[in-house]
């Protein structure tokens, strides 16, 4: 739950697929799901290539162990980001880009606990300005 955010925020989005099961799924509300570790690697490599600084603020974590090898979880997330901010400089703060909730399912594998599915449900986001 927290490692996902830390990897992205520390500039290591390319390592995020390691957190998922081989057949893991990541889905953002309103977008097509990204399924399987190969597709996840491609998706997070694109994220890694962006000149974007981000901060994922994770709150209200809940985890329910359903069986020895299965669990579910959720947490609230606020995402702040800014593009093109040089390393070591303070980025502009113009509000959260997304406020929502991650809803996860987890599976224990030979490599330990992995994300089987992660869905981002969006509660709030800034209005879209036409032409901008």
PLM regions and their residue ranges:
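A generic structural micro-feature
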Residues: 52-55, 94-98
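Binding-site signature for planar aromatic cofactors or substrates
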Residues: 1-2, 38, 68, 131-132
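Short beta-strand edge/turn micro-motifs at domain boundaries
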Residues: 70-72, 97-129
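Short structured motifs
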Residues: 1, 57-60, 101-102
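Short, surface-exposed loop/helix-turn segments at secondary-structure junctions
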Residues: 85-96
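A solvent-exposed, acidic/Ser-Thr-rich amphipathic alpha-helical stretch
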Residues: 13-84
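Short acidic-aromatic low-complexity motifs
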Residues: 2-18
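A short, polar/proline- and glycine-enriched secondary-structure boundary/capping micro-motif
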Residues: 82-87, 125-132
